[in-house]
Amino acid sequence: MARLEVPRPATFVTLTGFMGVGKSRIGRELARALMLHFIDLDRYIERRTGISIPDIFRHLGEEAFRRMEKEAVRELVGKDYLVLSLGGGTFMDPESQKALLGRGPVVALWASPETILERAMRKPGERPLLQVENPLERIRTLLEARAPVYRKAHIHVSTDGRRVEEVVEEIVEKLWRHAEARGA
């Protein structure tokens, strides 16, 4: 059966950014708006391994998790019709970063450290990197270290104080501008 081709600015979009910026929620809605499939990389890894992300960190360590992420990215960049929501640290890997930047538009989502903390605390057990005495300071430190890499994304959108629909609308507009600039 032939796939119905509809006008869309991209057939593979990656969402990156720090934990708690809204990549998963926004990714689902963006995929719906663009009529693409949605994959949350963390959930994908959990399904493949049968182990939750916190348990992977706890029992196998961060290094093992990063290897799993890299392998999953390598596999998924070969897919089409996909919005891929990365884990907060996935884009830090140079190999994954290069593959994703070359595959299609990468959208970096941003939020303030305070917003990130508030959102992350809604699911405290799911955020292994924040199991520290001062999580806000940890967020600031990690965000400062990761920001130069997130800035390599093609498109940047703030999620602070905004509804998901608003953010998705802005991303779609910027994806069309990005496609036009590239002559697609």
Swiss-Prot record:
Substrate binds at residues 42, 66, 88, 146. One of its GO terms (biological process) is chorismate biosynthetic process. Belongs to the shikimate kinase family. It comes from Thermus thermophilus (strain ATCC 27634 / DSM 579 / HB8). GO terms for molecular function: ATP binding; magnesium ion binding; shikimate kinase activity. Its EC number is 2.7.1.71. It catalyses: shikimate + ATP = 3-phosphoshikimate + ADP + H(+). It holds the Pfam family SKI. HAMAP family: Shikimate_kinase. Keywords: Amino-acid biosynthesis, Aromatic amino acid biosynthesis, ATP-binding, Cytoplasm, Kinase, Magnesium, Metal-binding, Nucleotide-binding, Transferase. This is Shikimate kinase.
